Amino acid sequence: MAHFTDKLVLGAWMLEQFGVETLETFKGLLADPNLVGFDEENTSLFHYELINKPFRARAMSDDTLRLYDENIVRHWRRITERRNQAGSTLYPLYFQYLALLFTEHYLDRYFTDRATLCADLNAFREQFNTDLPEREQIEPFQERDLNKLAIWIATGGGKTLIMQVNILQFQHYLARARRAREFNRTILLTPNEGLSLQHKEELDLAGIHGDLFVKDGGSLLSAGAVEIIDIHKLKEKSGEVTVAVEAFESNNLVLVDEGHRGAGGEDWMAKRNQLCDNGFSFEYSATFGQAIKAASGSELAPTRAGQSPSKRYKLVQQYARCILFDYSYKFFHADGYGKDHLILNLKEEQLAEQRQLYLSACLLAFYQQKRLFADRHKALLPYLLANPLWIFVGGKVTAKNEANAETVSDIHAILQFLARFLANRGGESVEFLELLLTQRDDLRDERDRRIFGKAFPYVQTAWATSQARELFQDLLQVVFRAAAPGLLHVVHLKGGGTGEIGLRVGENDWFGVINVGDAAKLIKQLDADRDSNMVVTDQTYATSLFERINKPDSTINLLVGAKKFTEGWSSWRVSTM
């Protein structure tokens, strides 16, 4: 069976429009870091490469390419003007530029002659299908469906910047076609309220007027604003805090951020389709592939007459014809971006007995980042690195179940580790650091290889093998903001509606914060545990530690939480997960 990425017919057609077959060809031409930027004539350096090294059969002239580039540069300068006031000038990277270039060409064709565009796409589709098995072939493009585009881009790839330029690109081509009066609103759909708030802040930075939806709050009357609403507030009928889809009418520009994560697939798609009926939509996601896999049924076309196709088949057909640009994680990571996964595969029999030593090694790896950031701060300035932050994302918050009364939640287990490390009873933590410093820890994988053998080069340069105690003292100061070992204070912060749990050693500054949906329940479980290394209390505290994490004066080095904070939250600080 062909892979889903091999069925992206719209993306393949767009590559052919520029005379290439794969994204890698573009990468070879444009990925040089020296090509990032604009010249004194407000032309991108990428443009000169595209003009000077034309591919075998480009569908547009040099003059058209220049117009596309002028539009991209103009829009980019607008959305980054305020952002650049922070001190660093933002320019599009090659894959961001290509996403915008592809959008330029598509919108140009779409608003010039939609019927001819549809005919050209179907002519290409016929040839494209010859490489696919019969039951996996792509169904014909329909003119009525050409108003839906999707951008597949990995998390961290600049999706928000691309979306904001797409708004300006669409407005430009709409005005050129003299159809601006035909469109009612620009609506941005998000999967949750947290992401709505984040988009509001990002639109403000871009100089684009955005309004959060407030039931009966007048936001629908803000002329020209991007109206931001999470998908759960759209219903068939209006309620106390919800609004009927029909209240927004049709003929809208609809922007969808991770739509399939906010509601059931068919549910949100029906709402999106109603909103953009006779309008247009852009959809953005890092996880189109996962959405396809999660859908039920087969990717193959039905074999019997009258048999309904599966949800998965319908999703494949839809996205194959609307994903304009694929820069999913495999491309992102191959370019040196994203996360480096360290899959350690500790021997199963070692996992329980050596958990404390294993997590101490994880802590030491984070300390190494903090120490390096402090020691080499000036040298690291050009790389725009932020103060390192360690995060734990737990799958379970509280977990006492009937099957196993001793079950400990992920978050509870992390707190037990921290409390035991900070207590250093019998010098255990110092002993563990010495084992790691001297490479005598004996933590091995299933192939009997030392899993932390090359993990601490900077620590081993900074500290002699005999200095484990001094290393422990410095680690306490750098990570935990403490001068000496002590009890872990787990404090339920009441007041201000934060629902957070603060972490500190004794009465020292906060070094960590727990952000979960039910803080009171977790506190109750911790209190019942009676851990001798942990003090569980509560305190009236109006300021949110979580919301201040990105502030320069934040003392927080550790963030522990569940899914609550993974959506609608962004931080350049995250360096260890």
Range-by-range predicted roles:
Residues 156:
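Walker A (P-loop) phosphate-binding loop of P-loop NTPases
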Residues 1-88:
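Extended, charged/polar low-complexity intrinsically disordered regions
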Residues 204-239:
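Inter-Walker segment of RecA-like/P-loop motor cores
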Residues 102-107, 160-179:
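Walker A/P-loop NTP-binding motif
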Residues 54-152:
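Conserved pre-motif I regulatory segment
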Residues 89, 118, 141-142, 180, ...:
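Conserved C-terminal RecA-like helicase domain
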Residues 123-126, 162-172, 228, 232-381, ...:
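Signature of the SF2 helicase/ATPase Hel1-core->accessory helical subdomain module
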Residues 161-162, 177-205:
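Conserved Walker A/P-loop ATP-binding site and its immediately adjacent core
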